[in-house]
C-alpha cells in the first residue's frame, strides 16, 4: 500500500501527469507560452544555474504559501528564452491530452478515450493543485478553474510584504 490514492508529476510549464495506479493522464497546457507563469522560490536558482540578473530585476517579494511557515517568497517572472524542458515538451504536445490504461498498456504506447476516467483524473489533478497551494496562474495554464480569482494571483501580487 502506497498510502495515497493518486500522485502527480511533471516539469515546469510542461505536461503534468496524474495517476491512480491504474490509469495515467497527461494534462498539457492550454498554450505553449509561459509568460503568465512565475517561479516561486526562497532559493533563486534553476536546477542547473543561478537566476540571471535580468530575471532577478523583475522579481517581487510576495506572500507566503501554506508550506513556507509564514516566510514570503520571491516571484520571478518566466522569461521565454530560459530553456525550460517543460515548454519544449508542451510544444510537442499531442492533439489531445493522452490517457493510458496501465493494466492493458503498461508501456503507455496507445492512448485510449474514456471520458469518465479522464474527468475523474482531471478532478484529482485539480484537488492536488488545491492541496499543494498552487498559484491561480498554474490552474489557468492547464485549463482548470482556479479556486480564487486569477486577478488575485493567489493574493500574492497585490499583497505587499512588510
Residue positions per predicted region:
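Short, solvent-exposed polar/charged micro-motifs at secondary-structure junctions
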Residues: 1-2, 15-21, 146-151
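WW-domain-binding short linear motifs
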Residues: 3-8, 115, 120, 139, ...
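C-terminal, low-complexity/hydrophilic appendages and adjacent surface loops
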Residues: 12-113, 156-161
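Short, solvent-exposed turn/loop segments enriched in Gly/Ser/Thr/Pro and often Arg
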Residues: 12-13, 132-148
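Short amphipathic alpha-helical coiled-coil/interface segments
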Residues: 121-125
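A short, highly charged, low-complexity intrinsically disordered segment
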Residues: 143-162
Amino acid at each position: 500500500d502506497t498510502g495515497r490514492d493518486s500522485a502527480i508529476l511533471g516539469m515546469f510549464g510542461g505536461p503534468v501527469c496524474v495517476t491512480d495506479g491504474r490509469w495515467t493522464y497527461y494534462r498539457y497546457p492550454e498554450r505553449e507560452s509561459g509568460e503568465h507563469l512565475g517561479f516561486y522560490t526562497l532559493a533563486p536558482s534553476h536546477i542547473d544555474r543561478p537566476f540571471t540578473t535580468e530575471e532577478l530585476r523583475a522579481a517581487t517579494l510576495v506572500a507566503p504559501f501554506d508550506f513556507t511557515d509564514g516566510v514570503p517568497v520571491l516571484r520571478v517572472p518566466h522569461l521565454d528564452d530560459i530553456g525550460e524542458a517543460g515548454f519544449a515538451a508542451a510544444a510537442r504536445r499531442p492533439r489531445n491530452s493522452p490517457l493510458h490504461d496501465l493494466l492493458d498498456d503498461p508501456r503507455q504506447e496507445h492512448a485510449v478515450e474514456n471520458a469518465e476516467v479522464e474527468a475523474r483524473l482531471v478532478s484529482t489533478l485539480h484537488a492536488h493543485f488545491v492541496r499543494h497551494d498552487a498559484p491561480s496562474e498554474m490552474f489557468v495554464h492547464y485549463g482548470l478553474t482556479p479556486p480564487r480569482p486569477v486577478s488575485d494571483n493567489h493574493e500574492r501580487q497585490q499583497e505587499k510584504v512588510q
